[in-house]
Amino acid sequence: GTVYVGDLAGVLHAVAAQDGKAAWTFKTGAEIRASPVVAGGTVLVGGYDNRLHALDPKTGASRWFFETDGQVHATSAVDAGLAYVAGCDGELRAIRVADGKQAFSIPSGGYTGASPALQGGRAFYGTFEDEVLGVDLEARKVAWRYQHPQRRFPFYSSAALGDGKVVLGGRDKHVHALDAATGKAAWTFATRARVDSSPAIAGGRVFV
């Protein structure tokens, strides 16, 4: 197997998992903070050069790139041949993995550093405009928006999905659970500091 990892110098490295030997490198135009994704026989990685890059997993050769209007900070979510990128340009973009063409885009109303969570034909993610969005991908529109009724704070954390809930951390020092269908608040849990990490759900529990 092969491990793919980006660095702050803007280089994506392919390393053999067995012995750690370098297989290839690919230089982008700026730092890489997103995790690479392998989908459809293609390595996808976003960068601060405002691009989503698609590379050959064996050679590192560029297959295509898609230029957005802002930095691509978060990891893409891939489903049914589409890479969903919620980026710093305030757009949720669906990019075809096969050829790098944009299928559609939906305005988010704010930039995001979170990776979209996909389930049931919807995408869920928070923004730096203090909102969490539930986006209907078939209708290509925002189904609901959540904003805390008293506090204003960004959602940097990527969401986890389970038991009909969207669970993510907020910079208000709380973990928030929202109803996935309606976006209404289900519960919150207070922590001692802002929650930028992404929750994981297993065995009926949330770990963060």
What are these regions (language model features)?
Residues 16-20, 56-60, 96-100, 136-140, ...:
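Short loop/turn segments that connect beta-strands within beta-propeller blades
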Residues 7-9, 24-39, 48-51, 62-79, ...:
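Extracytoplasmic beta-rich repeat domains
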Residues 12, 22-23, 175, 185:
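Short loop/beta submotifs within extracellular cysteine-rich repeat domains
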